[in-house]
Amino acid sequence: MKKREHITRVLVRGTAALLAAVILTGCGKAKLPEGFEVSAVKEKAEQSIELFNARDYEALWEMGSDELKESITVEQFAQACDPYLDKCGAFEEISKSVVMGGTDKNAGIDYAGAVMVGDYEDGKIQFTVAFDQNMEMIQFLIK
C-alpha cells in the first residue's frame, strides 16, 4: 500500500506542477528551462505515445527515470493503460499539443513536459508526459 501511496503522491505533485505551469503562463507559453528544446520534448512525448499505442509497456517503462521505474512496474503500466486502449480503439492522430516547463522546487529539478490529446476510433485520450534534464520520463499520465 505504501508504494501505491508514493506513486499517487508523485503523480499528483507532477500533475499539479504541470497544470500550474499551463495556467500561470497562458496555456503553454511557458519558457522551457535552459537545456530543453521544444522539438525534443515533443518528439519524446510522441515516442512515448507510440509505445503506449503499440502496448509496448516495457519500452515505455525503459524511457523512465530510475525513480519512475522504482515506483511502477511494467505490469502496473499494462493494467493502467490497457483499459484505455480497449475502450478507445485504434489510434488516429494527435489533435492538440502543448509543451511547457518549470522547476520542481521540492525536488530541485527542472523539467519539461507535453500535454497531448490523441484522437482514437472511439474516443480521445489526454496524455501528460514530463521529462527531466536527461530527457528521462518522470511522468506519464493518461485520462
Language-model segments: which ranges?
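Exposed beta-sheet edge and beta->alpha loop/turn motif
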Residues: V98-K143
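Bacterial N-terminal signal peptides that target proteins for export
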Residues: K3-T15
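Short solvent-exposed beta->alpha transition segments
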Residues: E58-I109
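Bacterial signal peptide processing site
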Residues: G28-A30
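Short, aromatic-enriched amphipathic alpha-helices that serve as compact interaction elements
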Residues: E37-N53, M63
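C-terminal motif of bacterial Sec signal peptides marking the signal peptidase cleavage site
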Residues: I23-G26
